[in-house]
């Protein structure tokens, strides 16, 4: 079919656009704005000539760079994104990590004497949110992240997968300052390590390993033998930490960006 046979309609309300040929739906796209002000899009499988007009509709609405991700095994979709004017931004690998301290090497690992570890359930929510924001500035692909207080409360505490034993906060015993956290979420499948981080002045003291030791010990005692996690392939410290724990790679994703004004042919509009 020629491209002009496709008509794009935005669903109301929401950030979903659908492509039609006459009265037949031939494709759809969903957009969402993350707390780091990055617009991500996701396509539903559709007819080949639906993707470009759907993407153009989102670009016209947001006026921003658009981001997309695909599994590195989805070669057809990777090629489609490249053909739509997306360029590869980064690669992220997924890992499976054991929780057994005898395997991870975390047996007996504890936090420094001047650090106290508390559950997120006992933390001040605003301070925890600001710590989360600060740590994400050093996570590839999430710089600029700023949580809305309401969204953070829902994401952190109202979710069914919140586990107070594996969402832990490191506190400077002298100043009371929040200086690090580990967050492992329990889901219907394997638990997932969502974030592990320590603020810059407190790094290289073994605090990240100590937080992981506490969270993984709790999981192991609960009978959860493995945890999933993701790390940017180019972020050597994160990858090295996971591999040192005995992690094995499961697969990965590729993140793409289409810069504002770039068309589906990859040319400047």
Give a label for each model feature.
Residues 29-36, 141-198:
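A conserved beta-strand-loop-helix scaffold within acyl/acetyltransferase catalytic domains
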Residues 1-2, 7, 131-146, 158-160:
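Helix-loop element at the rim of GNAT/NAT acetyltransferase active sites that forms part
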Residues 1-12, 259-269:
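Actinobacteria-biased recognition of intrinsically disordered, low-complexity terminal regions
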Residues 3-62, 67-72, 179-191, 199:
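Conserved donor-binding loop and adjoining core beta-sheet/short helix segment
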Residues 82-105, 213, 220-269:
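Active-site/acyl-donor-binding loops of N-acyltransferases
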Residues 45-116, 254-258:
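Acyl-donor-binding surface of acyltransferase catalytic domains
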Residues 1, 8-11, 115-130:
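A short beta-loop-alpha structural element at the N-terminal edge
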């Amino acid at each position: 079919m020629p491209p002009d046979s496709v008509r794009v309609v935005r669903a109301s309300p929401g950030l979903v656009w659908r492509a039609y040929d006459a009265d037949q739906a031939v494709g759809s796209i969903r957009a969402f704005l993350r707390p780091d002000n990055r617009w991500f899009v996701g396509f539903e499988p559709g007819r080949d000539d639906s993707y470009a007009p759907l993407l153009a509709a989102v670009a016209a609405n947001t006026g921003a760079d658009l981001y997309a991700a695909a599994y590195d095994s989805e070669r057809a979709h990777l090629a489609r994104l490249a053909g739509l004017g997306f360029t590869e931004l980064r690669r992220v690998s997924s890992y499976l990590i054991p929780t057994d301290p005898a395997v991870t090497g975390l047996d007996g690992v504890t936090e420094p004497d001047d650090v106290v570890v508390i559950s997120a359930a006992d933390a001040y929510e605003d301070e925890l949110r600001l710590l989360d924001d600060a740590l994400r500035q050093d996570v590839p692909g999430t710089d600029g992240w700023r949580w809305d207080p309401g969204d953070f409360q829902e994401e952190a505490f109202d979710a069914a997968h919140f586990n107070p034993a594996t969402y832990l906060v490191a506190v400077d015993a002298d100043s009371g300052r929040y200086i690090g956290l580990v967050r492992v979420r329990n889901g219907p499948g394997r638990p997932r390590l969502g974030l592990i981080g320590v603020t810059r002045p407190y790094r290289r003291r073994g605090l990240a390993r100590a937080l992981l030791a506490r969270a993984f010990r709790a999981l192991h005692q609960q009978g959860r033998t493995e945890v999933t996690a993701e790390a940017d392939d180019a972020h050597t410290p994160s990858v090295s930490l996971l591999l040192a724990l005995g992690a094995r790679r499961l697969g990965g994703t590729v993140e793409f960006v289409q810069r504002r004004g770039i068309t589906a042919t990859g040319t400047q509009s």
